[in-house]
Every structure is written in C-alpha cells, then in structure tokens.
C-alpha cells in the first residue's frame, strides 16, 4: 500500500489515511480535529472534502443572494486562519509510510474523542502522487513546486483560493 514518488531528486514514501465520520462535521469540530491531526509527527498533508458552502446562491430564482450558513466560518489550524468552504464529510491525511503505525494509533485516539457518532478509517492511496497534465498546465516546471501540491490543482481556480498550506 506504500507509494513511492521520485520527485526533486529524492524518494518520498507516503500512505493515505481516510477518515470518514458518520456525520458531517461542524466548524468547531473540524478545527479541533485538524489541530490534533497536525500535532502528530509524520503528517505530509491533510485534505478536507465535503459539500460546498457557497457564499451566494449559485442558481435558481435566488441566484446571487448571500447564503448565511452557520458552518462557513474562519477556523484556525496551527495558527493559520482559513475559511471553511465545505461541510466536512471526510478527511484524507497523507503520512510518511515508516511512521504509519504510530500515526494510526494517534488518529484512532483523535477519532474516538471527537466522533461519538462513529467513523470509518481506511488506509490506501486516495490522492495523486505523480504530476498530472493539469499540474503541468498550471505550474509549468514541476521540479520547482512543493510536492504536497501535486494533484491539488483546480485548473479554473486560483491556487490561493483553493489550497491552504498549513505546515
């Protein structure tokens, strides 16, 4: 289940861990869980997925009107402020392969404390580890970018609007 990425003249061995809570997370819970995850040693990157929380109604008769959703908040993760734009339904953590067992113990404890409603944890490859065509189109010379950005590209969005680098 380990993936090797030859990038910038080094080999990075990484494994993805997916946390799938049985309910969507509130902004406060998301903030708490992300801070606890980033306290673990060996975390490469963390991705949150979920239903979008738009600022304005995207279509229909109310198109353009503001959406005042209670979970579209600014949260603080490791001292960095970020706007939560999704109702978090899953968290994908990319970890260093050699630290997987220790990290899994920590993740299990974090989940037990914060998800009394239940959760599932999966280990595998859930993210891109090799540069995609879109990466080449967006960045050009791939050898000069941070390896954590591989596969994180939305071709139609600005990087600062779609990716927040925490660590």
Curated annotation (Swiss-Prot):
- Presence of keyword Ubl conjugation: no
Q: Which domain of life is it from?
A: Archaea
Please give the Pfam families that the UniProt record associates with this protein. Answer: MCR_D
Q: How does it assemble?
A: MCR is composed of three subunits: alpha, beta, and gamma. The function of protein D is not known.
Name of the featured protein:
Methyl-coenzyme M reductase II operon protein D
- Give the GO terms filed under biological process for this record: methanogenesis
- UniProt xrefs under InterPro entries: Me_CoM_Rdtase_D (IPR003901)
For this UniProt record, give its keywords in alphabetical order, as a comma-separated list. Methanogenesis
